[in-house]
């Protein structure tokens, strides 16, 4: 599901809100989440999961075109850990 599909489905379910209001709300939620993660804060949404940052240590990578070694610096990457409720729901519907 894309962001625009999410906005469309929410606007259909929440008929008292316009599509523009739903779009603005979704964008604001995502912006607040990005700001929290960029400050190193953990985001927990009970029943859904948590977002946090994981550190990737510096390493030597390879340029796929040339095969040449490339030094890659350490960095933080966003990580999502699904909650128990979400995992169970997904496993029920997929199985």
From Swiss-Prot:
Pfam families the UniProt entry points to: Bac_DNA_binding
Keyword Mitochondrion applies: no
Keyword match Mitochondrion: no
SMART domains assigned: BHL
Gene3D superfamilies: IHF-like DNA-binding proteins
GO cellular component: chromosome; cytosol
UniProt xrefs under NCBIfam families: hip (TIGR00988), PRK00199.1 (NF001222)
Quaternary structure and interacting proteins, as annotated: Heterodimer of an alpha and a beta chain.
Family per similarity comment: Belongs to the bacterial histone-like protein family.
HAMAP family: IHF_beta
Protein name per Swiss-Prot or TrEMBL: Integration host factor subunit beta
UniProt source species: Colwellia psychrerythraea (strain 34H / ATCC BAA-681) (Vibrio psychroerythus)
Gene that encodes it: ihfB
């Amino acid at each position: 599901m894309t962001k625009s599909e999410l906005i469309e489905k929410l606007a259909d379910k929440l008929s008292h809100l316009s599509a523009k209001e739903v779009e603005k709300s979704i964008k604001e939620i995502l912006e607040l989440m990005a700001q929290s993660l960029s400050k190193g804060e953990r985001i927990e949404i009970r029943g859904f999961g948590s977002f946090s940052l994981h550190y990737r240590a510096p390493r030597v990578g390879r340029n796929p075109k040339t095969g040449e070694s490339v030094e890659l610096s350490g960095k933080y990457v966003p990580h999502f850990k699904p909650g128990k409720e979400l995992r169970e729901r997904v496993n029920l519907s997929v199985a």
